[in-house]
Amino acid sequence: MIRHVKTIALLILASGLLAPLAQAQDMDVIQRMKDREEIEHLMWRYTRALDTFDPDAYVAVYTEDGAFGQVKGHDALYKMIADLRASREQRAAEGNPPPEMFHATENYWTEFVTKDHARHHAYWVTYYGANGPDAPARMIQVGRSVDDLVRVNGQWLIQSRNVAPQD
């Protein structure tokens, strides 16, 4: 009888000691799920900013020293998107409006390097929208990306974006 009481007491003690550990693990899982959702939203904002040629929204998803390939830093990233927008507006003014552009990201996976550093892997497709009711949308480019993301002041941002990794 005493042996059973000791066993029961040890089980109760162990469950009391393990409960905080289980709660901590649950909190880690919840945080990781929240991080994944925030990263998914970050990448949606990136795509939307690119497809609407919005330089302010585009630089807002990058760290101050963020890079898209060889284009590095907010000023250079802003100029890249502003120049694309100006070129499109110029073509439209000349009577040759370019079709709308759409990017789709598929089969993405987020790898957590540390709690504040993630690597986002994805396949992407670029489409040109129809220029008029009789013109079909066209797939113009496909590829794969590997992006390094970091948490800065509680917010996930793109540190570097590589849309043509060599591996």
Question: PLM features: residue spans?
Answer:
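C-terminal segment of classical bacterial N-terminal signal peptides
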Residues: 15-23
